[in-house]
């Protein structure tokens, strides 16, 4: 048995009259419950005003996660975005302009995905 356990504290957010469970950092617990209204709400909690460019990245992350069951590290995300959305968008500067507190971490939160681990 472990000497100590770190208990995850849950919270609830209400979006459009429906409750959604989040972890202590505001990441959605059940990614299947995500929708654009939830994404918009989570973006507001991160002080991100969603534009078409933000949604491109968020939808890309959701597709990537559905295919690989993991969120990409920033380097992988940058390369993949460049291939799919164009070289001008495949730069870390572009992604940091959209998500100033970290493209992987912040965009994953808005996309309803688990917090990325490792090198983000």
Where do the protein language model's features map onto the residues?
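Short, Lys/Arg-enriched N-terminal segments with co-localized hydrophobic residues
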Residues: 1-9
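A short, ordered amphipathic alpha-helix with a cationic face
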Residues: 27-32, 67-70, 81-82, 93-94
């Amino acid at each position: 048995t472990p000497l100590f356990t770190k208990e995850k504290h849950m919270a609830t957010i209400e979006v459009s009259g429906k409750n959604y469970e989040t972890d202590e950092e505001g990441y959605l617990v059940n990614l299947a419950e995500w929708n654009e209204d939830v994404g918009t709400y989570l973006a507001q909690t991160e002080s991100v005003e969603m534009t078409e460019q933000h949604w491109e990245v968020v939808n890309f992350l959701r597709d990537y996660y559905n295919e690989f069951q993991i969120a990409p590290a920033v380097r992988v995300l940058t390369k993949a975005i460049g291939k799919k959305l164009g070289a001008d968008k495949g730069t870390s500067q572009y992604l940091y302009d959209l998500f100033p507190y970290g493209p992987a971490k912040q965009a994953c939160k808005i996309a309803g995905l688990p917090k990325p681990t490792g090198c983000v």
